[in-house]
Amino acid sequence: MNIVLSYIGPLPEYTIDCIKQIRLFNTTSPIYLILDDIESQYIKQLEQYNVTLISYETVKHQDFLNLFETNKKQFSILEDLGVRKFLFMRSIERFFLLFNLMQQRSLTDVLFMEIDNTIYDDPSLWLEEFSQNDLCFMFDNEYRFSSGIFYTKTANSLIPLIICVFTNARKHICWYSDMIMLYELWDTNFSNNISLLPTHTSFVSSEHEFFQNGISQKIPLNILTYMNYGKFGDTIFDAAGMGVYLFGCDPCHSKGVIIHNNSEKTWSHIKYSQYEYKWERDSKNRNIPYINFGDGKWIRINNLHIHSKDLKSALSI
């Protein structure tokens, strides 16, 4: 397995926390970090984790940049976010950077993580199930899928995604993001070797109408949350809802304040604040999160999407 991260812009300090957490559970898999802030003050600290730094200039995708230049309104540039104003564009561009990196280095079996995620198991243990598919990611809500934890078998596995972006980007009025992109990819390719990681053990919810080759197919949204539960043992993944509840949302949504255990932000289809949580130390004294869905069974959480960027509070050691 190869692990790839990407951040374009001033490298945030929590990058160190993300990679430190990965190395707590996996000391051998190569980690690649795509960045343009090659003079970052945090580079020296990253060296201890055996990270290969990839300059943005060596993997940037000019065709995507041309698409962005001619369709800026669709990507919603958020001036209020300052240096993060290209958030939505970067959220999609990173898949093009990944594609170029995988081609250049002949990488396969890639775990592509968002930097504001913390993992709580060795991701190489997921590879046997991951590799049964071309792509793996998560359902979060209607019209929104999550790539906090994202797997791709080969560079060619990303081609349907790239085609999807070039096909659909111009159609959007605004707010085109990676979550919408993945929904559209699933909407047109959901029977074509894409797997959704389990984010629940069972859940009752409404139906959603997908179209496959122009033919309507209604799929209950609950199936998208647990259709693959059990393939990773008694564990689930976090698309966003658990991390948002436990460690807060991005301070830009809460007047600059990080609020833990906040049930007000419920962007996810599932309201995870209704469930019970606990942390337990494993045999190596690493703190691991668990969730109880009300049936008395504690389910291990493989990752948390720390939307607030307060990764330090979510570290295992």
List where the protein language model places each region.
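Conserved catalytic core of nucleotide-sugar-dependent glycosyltransferases
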Residues: 120-184
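Secondary-structure boundary elements
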Residues: 25-28, 100-111, 130-132, 153-158, ...
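Non-transmembrane alpha-helical segments in soluble domains
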Residues: 19, 23, 99, 182-187
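GT-A fold catalytic core of metal-dependent nucleotide-sugar glycosyltransferases
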Residues: 90-136
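Catalytic core and acceptor-binding pocket of nucleotide-sugar-dependent glycosyltransferases
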Residues: 159-317
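N-terminal anchoring/stem segment of glycosyltransferases
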Residues: 1-80, 103, 154-160, 278-317
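Conserved glycosyltransferase catalytic-site signature
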Residues: 88-95, 175-180
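Surface-exposed cleft-lining segments at the edges of enzyme active sites
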Residues: 81-87
